[in-house]
UniProtKB/Swiss-Prot annotation:
Organism: Dictyostelium discoideum (Social amoeba)
InterPro entries: C2_dom, C2_domain_sf, C2B_Copine, Copine, Copine_C, VWF_A, vWFA_dom_sf
Record-given protein name: Copine-C
Named cofactor requirement(s): Ca(2+)
Binding locations of Ca(2+) 2: 23-24, 83, 85, 98
Superkingdom field: Eukaryota
GO molecular function, one term: calcium-dependent phospholipid binding
Gene: cpnC
Keyword Cytoplasm: no
Length: 539
């Protein structure tokens, strides 16, 4: 699968600074903020800049910066505040001597803060040189879906006794071009057809323009040759929503005939708009995303001390494939979890003298979690050599553990979503039980991400990834939604950022599908609680 290039949202950043260090002698500094983003091995690249504000040490900038937001990426941003005495044309032309200070953080860190606002120190030469205040706002698209049902009344009979009608809806471009946005099914032998409900994103329906002209054509379907036009009509989304629901269908070829009125009526009913909530709205309302990690400790991984072993701590590569997977996925998700604790389990190894398919990786039943990604990696590196490897490779127990934890937070006002990261080297041996657990889990606020390390074919893993259809367990129960994403580590081992992108790209959609399925909207946005911003002490 190719990593998604479609952003989850577009966000707008606004800036203020407070109590900047003055670099000018006669007057005050002329601050301007330059934004750069870390992009791959090439390091930071310039994105955009604010305007320059003259003679002001606590400026509020008018120009906003718009960025695409990707949940699955760590979008590291650096905000550099410069004292600009002369106009520059290139980012590289900046004089380092004119730097007031800079601040580096991730876009996710800003977006997950209460009020989507952060106030931080500007640092230069290890000294605080002022404060920067960054506010983020999602650029609102329509975020709505349109629903409508259509009915034909008294349509012309194009066949011997009846017609086989269907309809098309086109939106009209400013240049007059008609773009097809919807085509209904064919209703056989019926001049008073009732078509199934139309449901689609408002942007796709009318481009977000409620007054854009819509052309509607009704045809009689013919299995051989061209379909026969019954009639056309024109309207707008606004008119339909205001209750103009019956439209005469006109056939241009018949308008010159004496006594011609129309070729039937097209009627719309049950027309409504429904707001589509965004991933960022759930974040703003305090929805937490917690990470649970399960590490494969089966014998097929090889010896921890062998260079060919998958748990071998290869320092030249940044650790084992397991450690790199944890660092890649965990570093993205950790920004969205307020308490910072990550549950860590092992499976397929010996625990307390017998093979266990779900045991605390700390080896202490009273300590199921570690703090932050660094804590998980420390626990992993400390204990992996202490665990006797065994087998087989069973997933059901760790999924059941995740189900139990996801079931703890199902109150609407305590919105929490769990991501279970399973890192494994082999094929599943309890496929039926695993599918049964995943079908059960599809009703819960839970996603399962599987990273396959090593050289196995992972055929069963691809079956679990519901991209090719819903999972069905051995009892015939169908998964309510797709919650599994499988990624082979070797495909992205040379690019850890790409691994995180591919691994996590479906999480926002899966979270939204869960809360939509239970009819729960985002909580109201949390309020940013301001703190007194005091000038730095005299140096």
């Amino acid at each position: 699968m190719i990593p998604s290039s479609k952003p989850n949202s577009r966000v707008e950043l606004r800036f203020r600074c407070h109590h900047l260090k003055n670099l000018d002698i006669v007057s005050k500094s002329d601050p301007q903020i330059f934004i750069s983003e870390k992009r791959g091995p090439g390091g930071f690249q310039f994105v955009d800049c604010t305007e320059k504000i003259k003679n002001n040490l606590s400026p509020e900038f008018k120009k906003t910066i718009t960025l695409d937001y990707y949940f699955e990426e760590i979008q590291t941003l650096t905000f550099t505040v410069m004292d600009i005495d002369k106009e520059i044309t290139l980012f590289g032309d900046l004089d380092k001597n004119d730097k007031i200070g800079e601040f580096t953080t991730s876009l996710s860190n800003i977006l997950s803060r209460p009020g989507r606002k952060i106030v931080a120190d500007l640092i230069h030469h290890s000294k605080v040189t002022g404060k920067i205040e960054i506010s983020a706002e999602e650029i609102c698209q329509t975020n709505h879906h349109i629903f409508l049902s259509a009915e034909g009344i008294g349509l012309d009979k194009k066949d011997l006794f009846s017609s086989d009608p269907y309809y098309k809806i086109y939106k009209t471009n400013p240049n007059g071009e008609q773009l097809l946005v919807f085509q209904s099914i064919v209703i056989k032998s019926n001049v008073n057809p009732l078509w199934p409900e139309l449901h689609m994103e408002l942007e796709k329906f009318n481009g977000g323009d409620m007054f854009r002209e819509l052309l509607i054509e009704v045809y009689d379907y013919d299995s051989i040759g061209a379909h026969d036009l019954i009639g056309i009509t024109r309207t707008t989304t606004d008119a339909i929503l205001r209750g103009v629901i019956e439209y005469p269908l006109i056939n241009p070829k018949k308008t010159s005939k004496s006594g011609y009125k129309n070729s039937g009526i097209l009627k719309f009913y049950k027309v409504r708009l429904e707001k589509t909530h965004t991933f960022l709205e759930f974040l703003a309302g305090g929805c937490e995303i917690s990470l649970m990690t399960a590490i494969d400790c089966t014998g097929s991984n090889g010896s921890v001390n062998s260079f060919s072993g998958l748990h071998y701590n290869d320092l030249e590569k940044g650790g084992s494939a397991y450690a790199r997977s944890i660092a890649s996925v965990g570093s993205v998700l950790s920004s969205y979890d307020s308490d910072g604790f990550i549950d860590v389990f092992g499976f397929g190894g010996e625990y307390q003298g017998r093979t266990s398919h779900c045991f605390p990786f700390s080896l202490d039943p009273n300590v199921p979690s570690a703090f932050g990604v660094a804590g998980v990696l420390e626990m992993y590196n400390r204990n992996i050599s202490k665990i006797p490897f065994s087998g087989p490779t069973n997933f059901a127990s760790v999924i059941q553990e995740a189900i139990a934890r996801a079931s703890e937070s199902r109150l609407p006002y305590q919105q929490k979503y769990t991501v279970l990261l399973i890192i494994t080297d082999g094929e599943i041996c309890d496929m039926d039980e695993t599918i049964k657990c995943l079908v059960q889990a599809s009703n819960l606020p839970l996603s399962v991400v599987i990273v396959g390390v090593g050289l196995s074919s992972f055929e069963n893993m691809n079956l679990l990834d519901g991209d090719n259809g819903c999972l069905v367990d051995y009892k015939g129960n169908r998964a309510k939604r797709d919650i599994v994403q499988f990624v082979p580590f070797n495909k992205y081992s040379g690019n850890i950022n790409a691994l995180a992108q591919e691994t996590l790209k479906e999480i926002p959609g899966q979270l939204l599908s869960y809360f939509k399925s239970i009819g729960v909207p985002p909580n109201p946005p949390r309020t940013f609680i301001p703190v007194d911003i005091l000038p730095p002490p005299p140096q």
